[in-house]
Design a protein with these regions (language model features):
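Short, small/polar residue-rich loop motifs at catalytic or cofactor-binding pockets
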Residues: 5-7
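Gly/Ser/Thr-rich active-site cleft segment
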Residues: 13, 49-163
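Glycine-rich phosphate-binding loop of actin/hexokinase-like ATP-binding domains
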Residues: 9-39, 78-79, 83-116, 156-215
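Residue-level signal for inorganic ion chemistry
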Residues: 1, 29, 68
Length: 215
């Protein structure tokens, strides 16, 4: 089995995997905007592109961790791991701390999924972030304790899990190159499946309107 939850959120937990506060949601929670601006000035544009791959924004988990460090030091001090909603559920089911979202956690992880210890110090300790795994990797099984709490069968294999958008993409068949879908909700996303890594394209700063559709 696998779990999905809102992507690019940040949930600090203690050593018993108990949430220390409500999760900070993805980019619609803009509380870390000042941290994003500070980091942009701190690194400079060229270094930002190298480390983050895009302009830093409140959707980046690193900015949320920095916000917690600055504004909720008592929560920050008690944090054993900074997780996502999905990795929290996986940890509660299996006792294993793994995470898929290394992209949203840049620059805390390197491209190969290993911890970027050289950059971690500004945000957190290297041991406060979970090990990376692919979303379909089997990372453990449902523990007897989790089975008693959920009604699931003990020993059921559990995969890493993923964010909401990825799960929705798979649910509508976005698994072959050339397929695409739109996701509507609090945010709108367009997904297109390719057979190679495309990378990120930097958009101009500021507000604007983009016309879509066919006339």
């Amino acid at each position: 089995m696998g779990t999905s939850a809102l992507g690019t959120d940040c949930l600090p937990v203690d050593e018993q995997c108990r949430p220390l506060r409500p999760a900070i949601l993805y980019g619609i929670d803009a509380r870390a905007s000042e941290e994003a601006a500070w980091l942009t000035e701190h690194y400079g544009q060229a270094r930002v592109q190298e480390l983050f791959g895009h302009p830093i924004c409140s959707g980046d988990t690193a900015t949320k961790i920095l916000w917690l460090r600055r504004h909720e030091p008592e929560i920050y001090a008690k944090t054993a791991y900074f997780l996502t909603g999905s990795s929290f559920l996986t940890a509660r089911l299996t006792g294993k701390y793994v995470i898929l979202a290394k992209g949203s956690f840049r620059p805390l992880y390197q491209a190969d999924g290993s911890v970027n210890e050289a950059e971690c110090g500004l945000y957190c300790r290297p041991d406060q972030i979970a090990a990376c795994a692919w979303s379909t990797d089997i990372v453990g099984t449902v523990t007897p304790e989790a089975a008693a709490q959920t009604g699931l069968a003990a020993g059921t294999p559990v995969i890493t899990g993923t964010g909401d958008s990825t799960a929705e993409a798979i649910s509508v068949g976005l698994v072959e190159p050339g397929t695409a879908f739109f996701q509507y909700g609090s945010s709108m996303f367009y997904y297109y499946c390719t057979d190679h890594f495309v990378g990120s394209y930097v958009s101009p700063q500021g507000n604007g309107a983009l016309k879509g559709g066919k006339e």
